[in-house]
Amino acid sequence: MFRSIRDMLMTKSSLRALRHRDFAMVELAGWSAAAGFWFYRIGLQVLTWELTHSGAWLGIIAVAESIPLFLLLPVGGTLADRFDRLILARLIQLAVIIVTAALAVVTILGWITPLVLVVLAVAHGVTGAFWMPVRLAMVPNLVPRDDLGAAVALHATLFNLARFLGPALAAPILAVWGVGPAFAVGAACYIPFFIVLFLIKLNNTDARAEAGRKMLDHIREGFVYAFSHAALKYLFVIILVSAVFGRAYMDLLAGISEVVFSRDPKEGVAI
């Protein structure tokens, strides 16, 4: 009975993509990694505010993390098309673990300064610029074409669920143990996903075909393709506007929660 119910759910909804072992492992372990990102993100804001009590420094840290994302995302997308995505994923996730663990260590040992935060934020931004296109490009290599729509929908759902629950999970750890342990927990959250990357295989990609092309030509063709389609062009504009004018509030929440609402920054940022 339960098997028939499960089969029905798998067939008639986006959950059917979980029939594929490797995709299911990546998504479930990837949720842990996504939650770890929010431990880092919330902790970074709180720590910046505790060190400086400056809205300007909150902005500096946000810019330090965003500039690599803006500049290197096209390069990351090109690498995801030209090289083995699984190897890239392993290397990038290892770098993320190292950066987050380093942030935990320097915070716990009391070595943290605003300048150290800037350096580590830049490093994390670099990993994010390479990870985002690899993460998205891996999904089509984990399921057959018939289940691709369901896989993309489920991937987006779980990713946004982590965006909602990650800060809520980080808040009690920040409140009870502090920022350093929160970073340590965040680094640990990446480990299950890192292990899973050695247990899966990706379907064949076109990496070899793309490897012979010049990287700059590949990037230019990507921009031409994106802006030659009206739907994609307007979508990029919407994303750019929301990133420029909407993200600022998220990056300043630690200061806003204390200055405007007289709340502990840990509570305000988590909310």
Describe the residue ranges of each PLM region.
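Alpha-helical transmembrane-bundle signature of multi-pass membrane transport and export proteins
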Residues: M1-I271
